[in-house]
A protein has these predicted regions:
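Membrane-proximal intracellular helices of multi-pass ion channels
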Residues: 1-445
């Protein structure tokens, strides 16, 4: 358990978080290697099991083997649990075990829990964790119940399992699906492109899972009284709405000319929702225009919101960057939102995170392109999908060399643990300067 590591090694809470994710990934890979995990009853090569486990725990959805046709029922169940652990977070899952066992949680453990979900304070953290766990199970159950009639109609009783799996995968923004076959692998939700129930339920699960647990709490406590929400929830909801509607309009006019009416609108909406770390697709992405692929790369890098099941640099990071630019245009000293001033250190963190994701995205895509001899645009798409923990692909991931797949594994891992968590885990408070250096200016622009 992460708590034991914390006590014995005197690690910081951030180091516990990143080691916890690594431990679960390795354990999942070893389980997936077992013959019982595959349909053919063979030992799965370690690199394939590791890639799948990393993709599941990091709630990405990229795959080197088709989930529906390669993995057995046992293997699929393991993947679903890895997705659930990854979506909630390793520390949150460990907390659930502690709560269910009735064990007392120490102040150090509460502090780690606070950092794991970026809670503003330690007080009430156990109650909040309980709220998150109950809310997660309830939402996933409701999502599964809505999809059961559709999947049972198409797959019989197996449709119940498929509904549960896809509900967990959608809520956790993972993008794994069981719809592929030996003859038609990696199809995602393309066979349900015009099914309103599947489209709407999957979209709602993705959005709810991606807005963050603290936004849930605001909505739960204050219902639809937007003015009573915390500023973070206001920024998240406003940014999320803009990042759904504006790209949806773009996709509506840019693509899907072969569809008409409600089906075209549904496809455009789904394509606007899924790039922000979900990874499902209802159309062949390779057929999209270059402009649409560029838009999807941007959405994949932005991702979901803080303290959510989603990855990416986060909606708040993107919003703060825009607000900072707006403040500069207006010659304002302070960055403001909804009548509140935002601390300069938060803006600095947002800039750092955005730069980290951009560097990882570009370096990863460039390296894969050079090594594989593939078009840079396609490799950048896969890199953005990995570091944003999205799972959308142009179809090249299963064909990549092992070294390129290892690069994607690293990108998925770094994208899931988060920029600030990684920074704080590597650079402790001991590295802070005890004295401030003289101030000077430098010309920019």
């Amino acid at each position: 358990m992460p708590w034991k590591i914390y006590k014995k090694r005197h690690l910081t809470s951030f180091q516990v978080i990143i080691l916890g994710f690594a431990g679960v990934i390795l354990f999942g890979a070893l389980i997936l290697m077992l013959p019982i995990s595959s349909v053919q009853g063979i030992i799965t090569p370690f690199h394939k099991a590791l890639f799948t486990s990393t993709s599941a725990v990091c709630v990405t959805g990229l795959a080197v083997v088709d989930t529906g046709s390669y993995w057995s029922a046992f293997g699929q169940t393991v993947i679903m649990f890895l997705i659930q652990i990854g979506g909630l977070g390793v520390i949150t899952t460990a907390t659930a075990v502690f709560i269910l066992s009735g064990r007392k949680i120490s102040i150090m453990q509460r502090s780690t829990m606070q950092n794991a979900i970026s809670a503003p304070k330690v007080g009430g953290i156990v109650r909040l964790m309980s709220f998150i766990l109950k809310g997660t199970l309830l939402i996933e159950l409701i999502g599964a119940l809505f999809m059961i009639p559709v999947f049972c109609h198409d797959f019989g009783l197996r449709g119940i399992w498929m509904s549960i799996f896809h509900s967990v995968s959608a809520f956790c923004n993972a993008g794994f699906d069981l719809l592929g076959t030996k003859w038609h692998p990696f199809v995602s939700l393309t066979s349900y492109a015009v099914n309103p129930v599947i489209n709407i339920v999957i979209m709602l699960l993705i959005i709810i899972g991606g807005i963050g647990f603290f936004t849930w709490e605001d909505i739960y406590l204050h219902k639809f009284h937007f003015k009573h929400y915390h500023m973070q929830s206001k920024v998240i909801l406003t940014t999320t709405l803009c990042l759904i509607l504006l790209p949806a309009v773009f996709f509506f006019f840019q693509d899907y000319g072969n569809l008409s009416g409600i089906h075209r609108l549904l496809a455009a909406l789904f394509q606007a929702v899924t790039p922000r770390t979900a990874g499902f697709n209802t159309t062949d992405l390779s057929m999209l225009t270059g402009a649409s692929k560029a838009m999807m790369i941007l959405l994949m890098l932005i991702g979901g919101s803080p303290s959510s099941t989603a990855g990416g640099m986060k909606t708040t990071t993107f919003a703060l960057l825009l607000l900072n630019v707006l403040a500069t245009f207006q010659s304002c000293d302070d960055v403001t939102a909804f009548g509140r001033r935002i601390d300069a250190s938060v803006i600095k963190n947002a800039t750092t995170i955005a730069m980290m994701y951009f560097i990882l995205f570009f370096a990863g895509g460039m390296t894969i392109s050079v090594y594989e001899g593939l078009p840079l645009s396609s490799c950048l798409f896969e890199a953005a999908s990995a570091v944003g923990t999205v799972g959308l692909t142009l179809g090249i991931t299963p064909k990549l060399h092992i070294l390129s797949q290892i690069i994607l594994i690293i990108l998925m891992y770094l994208g899931r643990v988060g920029g600030l968590t990684l920074i704080y885990a590597v650079f402790s408070d001991k590295n802070k300067r005890k004295a401030r250096l003289p101030l000077d200016k430098i010309i920019v622009g």
